[in-house]
């Protein structure tokens, strides 16, 4: 009988762990490969943990030989845009060299199904909104460029090596498992929803809004927040698609609905049932006015349909963060 092992690289992290939950629910056997630099061992609840770095070819070969996965899901990456500007070398080393090492190991092991976590940051500043997959890719920071380079490698490996891949370009991942088993946990935290919830919980002095003079309905930036379980569902569908013989494709993952920063803060205040201190500052360099996905292609190719709205995102995030003790 064919095994149902799926290697989830970076599976101890935020999106990876939620995808393991969904894979297990659909009858797959997740095998987590993670160096735990950003992941959490306690998030590995739906399969074994193989500790290792994506730049360690020997370790990758061992794990692939042991588990013989049918497909690889690759989440492992450094993701903080500000850090990528301060230390681009670390991002190129981890994100690009790490991905190329993983791809070489996959090809050597005869694995031709690969799902890659990419980002709307590969598009850069939007020419039009909502953005579809034909939008030009002109990333504006090292983080976005490392992901774009990996996308080019995947296309070439597909053309010349027979590797089939689904590239998933996320918009703003948010929310948590509704049972509170896993959730968003970054150190340091830079994402808007956890920061605002921490402000509401009194764990930080307040929340800072960068820019109130954007050309939007209330002057603050618009973003497309997508529930992490909707992202996870798309990854499982991408595995199904590849294992059924699907061809390489790049897909946006967003809801197609934009939320302003002020609307997001109102939603968090509603679920927190308390006001919190909000400060205002100048715009941050590189922040786009509006980033919203056109997700028609993902719906068409994967039969995927986002299930959760902003209320579900903020409620599940509040549930997770309010239960968690500060600092873990």
Curated annotation (Swiss-Prot):
Keyword NAD in annotation: yes
Species assigned in the record: Rhizobium meliloti (strain 1021) (Ensifer meliloti)
EC number, as in UniProt: 5.1.3.2
Family: Belongs to the NAD(P)-dependent epimerase/dehydratase family.
GO biological process, one term: polysaccharide biosynthetic process
Keywords recorded for this protein, A-Z: Carbohydrate metabolism, Exopolysaccharide synthesis, Galactose metabolism, Isomerase, NAD, Plasmid
Metabolic or biological pathway: Carbohydrate metabolism; galactose metabolism; Glycan metabolism; exopolysaccharide biosynthesis
Listed cofactors: NAD(+)
Name of the featured protein: UDP-glucose 4-epimerase
GO molecular function: UDP-glucose 4-epimerase activity
Active site: residue positions: 143
Binding site residues for substrate: 119
Reactions that this protein is recorded to catalyse: UDP-alpha-D-glucose = UDP-alpha-D-galactose
Domain of life of the native organism: Bacteria
Alphabetized Pfam families for the sequence: GDP_Man_Dehyd
Protein encoded by which gene: exoB
InterPro entries given in the database record: NAD(P)-bd_dom, NAD(P)-bd_dom_sf, UDP_G4E
Coiled coil ranges: none
């Amino acid at each position: 009988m064919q095994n149902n092992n799926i290697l989830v690289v970076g599976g101890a992290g935020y999106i990876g762990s939620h995808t393991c939950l969904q894979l297990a629910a659909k009858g797959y056997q997740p095998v987590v490969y993670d160096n735990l630099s950003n992941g959490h061992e306690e998030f590995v609840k739906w399969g074994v943990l193989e500790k290792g770095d994506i730049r360690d070819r020997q370790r990758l070969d061992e794990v692939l030989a042991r588990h013989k996965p049918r497909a690889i899901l690759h989440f492992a990456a450094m993701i903080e845009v500000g850090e990528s500007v301060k230390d681009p070398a670390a991002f190129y080393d981890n994100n690009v060299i790490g991905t190329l090492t993983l791809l070489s190991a996959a090809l050597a092991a005869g694995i031709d199904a690969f799902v890659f976590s990419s980002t709307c940051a590969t598009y850069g500043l939007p020419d039009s909104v909502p953005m579809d997959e034909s939008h030009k890719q002109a990333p504006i920071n090292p983080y976005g460029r490392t992901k774009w380079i990996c996308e080019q490698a995947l296309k070439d490996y597909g053309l010349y090596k027979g590797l089939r891949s689904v590239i998933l370009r996320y918009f703003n991942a948010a929310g948590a498992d509704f049972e509170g088993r896993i959730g968003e946990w970054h150190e340091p935290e830079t994402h808007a929803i956890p920061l605002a919830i921490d402000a509401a919980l009194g764990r930080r002095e307040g929340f800072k809004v960068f820019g109130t003079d954007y050309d939007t309905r209330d002057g603050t930036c618009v973003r497309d927040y997508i529930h992490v379980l909707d992202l996870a569902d798309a990854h499982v569908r991408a595995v199904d698609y590849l294992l059924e013989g699907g061809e390489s494709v790049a897909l946006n993952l967003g809801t197609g609905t934009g939320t302003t920063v002020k609307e997001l803060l109102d939603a968090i205040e509603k679920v927190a049932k308390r006001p919190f201190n909000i400060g205002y500052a100048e715009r941050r360099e590189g922040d786009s006015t509006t980033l919203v996905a056109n997700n028609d292609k993902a719906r068409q190719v994967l039969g995927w349909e986002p299930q959760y709205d902003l209320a579900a995102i903020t409620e599940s995030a509040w549930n997770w963060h309010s239960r968690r003790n500060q600092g873990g």
